[in-house]
């Protein structure tokens, strides 16, 4: 079982315009709206890859989170929340080949949110299962929120993966999560190290292992990915695919990694599966995520190399 936490779900709205102009009307060419947020995306991608998973989180008034997830075979355990679900807007400028992102913060969390999420996670993620704690924290929650949940879950025998940024990630590291999955920018903010400097990045990973982090999956976009364990490290090139949408690639990578680990795959195999999932995601437009058939097509073309430490 992979239980995916979604503290701050959203509407993911993606618009395309022929050319984006400031101080002038912009006519929308296409519009797509999906229920999203990192936790939702990880659950959707994991389900698409065949994993047994569920979504734990908040359900805002008028937000069809449960209905959307049910269509994809994901069980939901949601706590009713006041307010409206936030909107993440992406405007794709076709002429420039660039995307403008505008993300709302979302409603203020109440004091009962964290205890409620802890209880739901412990109730629906058995010992030996995985919990994925990902995404931004709602306003009102302290930065140590993921650290507190990590400690409680690990004490119950649950494996924990954390995918977040900034102070929340810094605090979570202190609780010794089994997996973290930073991208290049998040890794640099966490460690102060350029992730493209492999020797320095691996040294920073070893320091994180020394603080209790089990496995580090460092996603580097077109430069591929690194997987670091206390005793070994691996690299994998990025799949060669047409890039149609970057949104959700990291969530697909985490879903692929956890699906592989839950199936008992070795680390090198898990990295290949995660990289294929990310590649399968970027070749789809907007907020569409990976598909199992695409992952299986990409896997044979990926080569994982063990890095000499």
Protein language model regions, located:
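General beta-strand structural signal in soluble alpha/beta enzymes
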Residues: 5-7, 57, 77-78, 132-133, ...
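Conserved phosphate-binding/catalytic region of the ribokinase-like
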Residues: 170, 198-309
């Amino acid at each position: 079982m992979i239980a995916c936490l979604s503290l701050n779900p959203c509407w993911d709205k993606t618009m395309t315009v022929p050319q984006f102009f400031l101080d002038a009307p912009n006519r929308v060419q296409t519009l797509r709206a999906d229920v999203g947020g990192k936790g939702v995306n990880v659950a959707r991608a994991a389900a698409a890859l065949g994993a047994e998973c569920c979504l734990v989180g908040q359900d805002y008034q008028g937000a069809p989170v449960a209905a959307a997830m049910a269509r994809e075979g994901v069980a939901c355990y949601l706590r009713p929340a006041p307010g409206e679900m936030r909107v993440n807007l992406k405007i794709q400028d076709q002429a420039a080949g660039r995307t403008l992102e505008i993300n709302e913060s979302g409603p203020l969390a109440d004091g009962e949110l964290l205890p409620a999420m802890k209880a739901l996670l412990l109730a629906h993620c058995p010992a030996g299962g995985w919990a994925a704690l990902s995404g931004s924290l709602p306003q009102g929650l302290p930065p140590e929120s993921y650290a507190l949940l990590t400690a409680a879950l690990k004490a119950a025998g649950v494996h924990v993966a954390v995918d977040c940024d900034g102070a929340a990630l810094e605090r979570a590291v202190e609780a010794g999560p089994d997996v973290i999955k930073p991208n290049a920018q998040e890794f640099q903010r966490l460690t102060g190290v350029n992730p493209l400097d492999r020797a320095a990045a691996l040294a920073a990973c070893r320091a994180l292992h020394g603080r209790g982090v089990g496995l580090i999956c460092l996603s580097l976009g077109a430069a591929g990915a690194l997987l670091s364990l206390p005793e070994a490290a691996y690299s994998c090139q990025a799949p060669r695919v047409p890039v149609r949408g970057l949104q959700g690639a990291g969530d697909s990578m985490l879903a692929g990694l956890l699906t592989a680990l839950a199936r008992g795959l070795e680390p090198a195999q898990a990295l290949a599966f995660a990289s294929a999932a990310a590649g399968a995601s970027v070749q789809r437009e907007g907020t569409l995520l990976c598909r199992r058939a695409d992952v299986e097509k990409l896997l044979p073309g990926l080569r994982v190399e063990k890095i000499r430490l």
